[in-house]
Amino acid sequence: MKPLGILMLDTRFPRIVGDIGNPGSFDYPVIFRRMVGIGSKDAVAAHPDRPRMLAALKENAEALAAEGAVGLSTSCGFLALYQKDLEKLSPVPVATSALLHIRSLSGKKVGVLTASAENLTPAHFAAVDAPADTPVGGLPADSSFADTFLRNGLTLDRDAVERETVAAARALVAKHPQIDTIVFECTN
């Protein structure tokens, strides 16, 4: 079986089984490639450096394809912003974000839970052909989740992150009771 390539942000936080950055999350071959110098802050930025991000994505997509990857994914849902550009630049098929699933969930009332509600913009949804008015909920900026995954912490309090995620999902559904499906933007 030929491998899937994973474009990884340059991070140091723990990656537990289930995280896209942990090889144990897959029962097929994967190749990881760290985009040196491109971290969580770059990907989740309110105003990302688009030329720098695209250059890193292109360079690393080409390298993964040269290593034999037959398709690519990424370690950050915010990279949805570059889906259409990367489709043109990559020598192999690419799926940048779980947000791509929204368009396939026709007939569902979809909400999105994200690492940063304030930085997930209509442009991210447009880049994956999803409705711009999709309800969005986020984890708090002062959360254990943010300490680990947005601020690149060295430790992970799994229980705290679970509580925070469940609370954020409940708050999203309480605010938008029509939601019957939640897509998680974040791969962590």
Feature map (PLM): residue ranges:
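N-terminal glycine-rich anion-binding loop in soluble enzyme alpha/beta folds
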Residues: 1-52, 116-156
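Glycine-rich, highly charged phosphate/nucleotide-binding loops
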Residues: 45-63, 160-168
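N-terminal active-site wall of soluble small-molecule enzyme domains
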Residues: 55-59, 75-85, 89
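Short active-site oxyanion
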Residues: 68-72, 91-92, 178-182
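Gly/Ser/Thr-rich loops at beta-strand to alpha-helix junctions
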Residues: 71-83, 98-101, 115-119, 183-188
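Short, acidic/small-residue loops that bind anionic groups at enzyme active sites
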Residues: 85-107
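Charge-patterned, long linear interaction tracts outside catalytic cores
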Residues: 160-188
